[in-house]
């Protein structure tokens, strides 16, 4: 996505970025086009959700219990962030390297950075996490179904960290519950069926403009397990083939990289949209 911006330096202030309104509008239209594409039904999406009905039958009970335990641990994220909180300071350092002539010390400074820099850092974060997920998938693919039990919760953790990295890259604070709810919604959108995608996109349309939107989004997360099982089912055939010992390495790496790429793209689009809308509001 091509980004347009100009820089105006102001001595003693971090408010040195302006972006033309018409350029912001152009980028917003590209994101809205992407949103419409997400609401199309693809044959592979339908097909990919079938095998977990078989996988549930083939998976031993002790592995089901292990997955359940790990998912319960992940459930604390929405309330406290738990062990999945990201390193805000490390991401701020990336901004400082990109903008060496400016003082970038906080999220407030990040919020005023050029969108082009935000995009670049967010893409880098997503790419690094996708590579880590591929290694995770290849490792767990060695042992087939017995190591698959640990893979999905591990990738879920990487997904949460990826979305938090992207949130920070666009100047939002994942320590706030409002942002963790938004992150869960991004995760849901990346793995939902067409009905779910339409509902979530409609739900998030005015996330910052209307406080009722946030409250509605939070109340509609009926249970973390529902989010997790929808996420799990979206892996489909790729994870099904990962059950094959050794050969599962290839399928595991591919499935995980694909999943993290989709999640990173979703996070970038939705967080960038919020930042653009805020900047457009500032130009009114």
Describe the residue ranges of each PLM region.
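Terminal, membrane-proximal amphipathic helices
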Residues: 1-136, 165-284
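Conserved mixed alpha/beta catalytic, RNA-binding, or beta-rich assembly cores of soluble enzyme
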Residues: 155-159, 166
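Transmembrane alpha-helix interface/packing and boundary motifs in multi-pass membrane proteins
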Residues: 136-149
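A general alpha-helical scaffold signature found inside nucleotide-binding enzyme cores
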Residues: 158-161, 258
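Short, conserved micro-motifs enriched in small and acidic residues
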Residues: 150-153, 254
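Active-site metal-coordination segments of metallo-dependent hydrolases
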Residues: 152-156, 173-174
């Amino acid at each position: 996505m091509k980004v347009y911006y100009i820089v105006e330096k102001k001595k003693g202030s971090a408010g040195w970025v302006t972006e033309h309104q018409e350029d912001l509008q152009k980028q917003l239209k590209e994101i809205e086009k992407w949103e419409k594409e997400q609401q199309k039904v693809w044959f592979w999406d339908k097909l990919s959700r079938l095998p977990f009905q078989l996988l549930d039958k083939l998976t031993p009970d002790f592995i089901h219990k292990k997955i359940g335990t790990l998912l319960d641990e992940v459930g604390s994220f929405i309330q406290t962030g738990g062990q999945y909180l990201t390193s805000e300071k490390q991401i701020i350092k990336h901004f400082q390297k990109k903008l060496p002539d400016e003082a970038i010390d906080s999220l407030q400074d990040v919020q005023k950075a050029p969108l082009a820099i935000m995009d670049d850092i967010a893409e880098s974060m997503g790419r690094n996490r996708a590579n880590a997920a591929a290694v995770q998938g290849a490792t767990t693919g060695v042992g087939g179904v017995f190591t698959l039990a640990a893979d999905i919760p591990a990738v879920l953790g990487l997904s949460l960290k990826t979305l938090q990295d992207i949130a920070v890259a666009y100047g939002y604070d994942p320590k706030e519950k409002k942002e963790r709810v938004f992150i869960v919604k991004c995760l849901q959108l990346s793995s939902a069926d067409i009905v779910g995608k339409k509902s979530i996109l409609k739900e998030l349309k005015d996330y910052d403009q209307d406080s009722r939107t946030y409250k509605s989004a939070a109340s509609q997360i009926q249970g973390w397990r529902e989010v997790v099982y929808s996420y799990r089912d979206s892996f489909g055939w790729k994870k099904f083939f990962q059950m094959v010992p050794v050969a599962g390495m290839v399928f595991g790496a591919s499935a995980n990289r694909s999943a993290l790429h989709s999640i990173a793209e979703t996070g970038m689009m939705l967080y960038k949209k919020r930042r653009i809308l805020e900047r457009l509001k500032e130009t009114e």
